[in-house]
Amino acid sequence: MFTLKKTLLLLFFLGTINLSLCEEERNAEEERRDGDDEMDVEVKKRFITGLISGLMKALGK
């Protein structure tokens, strides 16, 4: 009975560690995806401001 409890306890802890590692990996992937989205927004903002300034120069001439 005692060895069964030790085995079950060991399996529980190993499962918990495995689950926490999976959560960390998933969080890291989400952070990478979020970072890419922020970069896309910055590029779009730069493009729009460049486009507007180019139009203003063309209309001002």
Curated annotation (Swiss-Prot):
Its main location: secreted. Keywords: Amidation, Amphibian defense peptide, Antibiotic, Antimicrobial, Cleavage on pair of basic residues, Cytolysis, Fungicide, Hemolysis, Secreted, Signal. GO terms for cellular component: extracellular region. The modification Lysine amide is found at K61. Expressed by the skin glands. Residues 1-22 form the signal peptide. It holds the Pfam family FSAP_sig_propep. InterPro entries: Frog_antimicrobial_propeptide. It is found in: Secreted. GO terms for biological process: defense response to fungus; defense response to Gram-negative bacterium; defense response to Gram-positive bacterium; hemolysis in another organism. The keyword Cell division does not apply. This is Temporin-SN4.
